């Protein structure tokens, strides 16, 4: 499944952002991070300094980490996954009880900073899911009227 997905990404000419940003419109920039297990992963400050900070800044990070820091730096929205919303019972309870992630699932706001952590549309490791539903997240961004 993973290799089929990676093949589809390559065949579809989809750009994976790894510690880089792309300005989509004059008002929107998306910044993608390398996985936190990568040794040469840039920090959030380096990435935001390289981006146009006069745009709405969306940070994509597989793991929902450094949320307080990202809110202080001025990111507008962080999109993450990784937790699969506790894909397999009882790991969903263990994750919550031992606070194994800064944020496990859903939408959270820190000041003006929004975080969305999705359970994803697939699983990890085992082709089963006994906790947390699969999902696609649809986000509608609307430009504020600044008149």
Could you say what each language-model-derived stretch is?
Residues 1-147:
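Soluble catalytic domains of enzymes that build or remodel membrane lipids, polysaccharides, and related
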């Amino acid at each position: 499944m993973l290799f089929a997905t990676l093949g589809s990404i390559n065949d579809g000419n989809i750009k994976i952002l790894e510690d880089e940003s792309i300005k989509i419109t004059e008002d929107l920039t998306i910044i993608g991070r390398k996985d936190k297990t990568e040794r040469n992963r840039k920090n959030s400050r380096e990435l935001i300094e390289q981006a146009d900070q006069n745009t709405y800044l969306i940070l994509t990070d597989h793991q929902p980490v450094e949320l307080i820091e990202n809110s202080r730096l001025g990111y507008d929205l962080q999109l993450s996954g990784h937790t699969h919303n506790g894909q397999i019972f009882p790991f969903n309870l263990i994750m919550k009880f031992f606070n194994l992630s800064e944020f496990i699932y859903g939408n959270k706001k820190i000041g003006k900073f929004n975080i969305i952590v999705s359970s994803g549309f697939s699983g990890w490791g085992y082709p089963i899911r006994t906790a947390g539903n699969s999902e696609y997240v649809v986000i509608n961004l609307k430009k504020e009227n600044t008149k």
